[in-house]
């Protein structure tokens, strides 16, 4: 696989996702980091996004709820280069009916090399990093070259 670069702008497009048992933890984290987050564009799966808006007043572009296709919608945005980083508080102790969607979402975040926090400590590191407020170059798959190679 060949790679190219993509610039993540100073104003980030951030996906916020949380499993049911982790929603309160994400809400608490968003509340604590509201000042940093208000400078960025927020996206979320359905229930999580609506809870964030109701509890913090921050504008959130909400997808469908995760089990109804919201995880896949966020994954599509990642593949299109429209999400720059993801905060995903997932529940490692309880299976969810849409586990394959969750795995696919995390796989796409890895393929497209976006920063991902799956717990509060890592999320804190991301928002407190100097890179959180600056443009950042990341390596991403060169899809055009990938497609050309496959069509030979």
UniProtKB/Swiss-Prot annotation:
The active site is at 71 (proton donor/acceptor). Its EC number is 4.2.3.3. Pfam families: MGS. Keywords: Lyase. It comes from the Bacteria. The keyword Lyase applies. Residues 6-152 form the MGS-like domain. It catalyses: dihydroxyacetone phosphate = methylglyoxal + phosphate. InterPro entries: Methylgl_synth, Methylglyoxal_synth_AS, MGS-like_dom, MGS-like_dom_sf. SUPFAM superfamilies: Methylglyoxal synthase-like. It is an enzyme of class 4 (lyase). One of its GO terms (molecular function) is methylglyoxal synthase activity. One of its GO terms (cellular component) is cytosol. The keyword NAD does not apply. Transmembrane segments: none annotated. SMART domains: MGS. Substrate binds at residues 19, 23, 45-48, 65-66, 98. One of its GO terms (biological process) is methylglyoxal biosynthetic process. Catalyzes the formation of methylglyoxal from dihydroxyacetone phosphate. Belongs to the methylglyoxal synthase family. This is Methylglyoxal synthase. The gene is mgsA.
């Amino acid at each position: 696989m060949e790679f190219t670069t993509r610039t993540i702008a100073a104003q980030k497009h951030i996906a916020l996702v949380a499993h049911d048992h982790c929603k309160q933890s994400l809400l608490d984290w968003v509340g604590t980091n509201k000042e940093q987050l208000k400078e960025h564009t927020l996206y979320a799966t359905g229930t999580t996004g609506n809870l964030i808006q109701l509890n913090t007043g921050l504008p959130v572009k909400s997808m469908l709820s995760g089990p109804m296709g919201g995880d896949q919608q966020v994954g599509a945005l990642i593949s299109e280069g429209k999400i720059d980083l993801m905060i995903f508080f997932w529940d490692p102790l309880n299976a969810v009916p849409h586990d394959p969607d969750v795995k696919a979402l995390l796989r796409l975040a890895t393929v497209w090399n976006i920063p991902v926090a799956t717990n509060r400590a890592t999320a804190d590191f991301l928002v407190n990093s100097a890179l959180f407020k600056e443009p950042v170059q990341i390596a991403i798959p060169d899809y055009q070259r990938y497609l050309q190679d496959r069509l030979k």
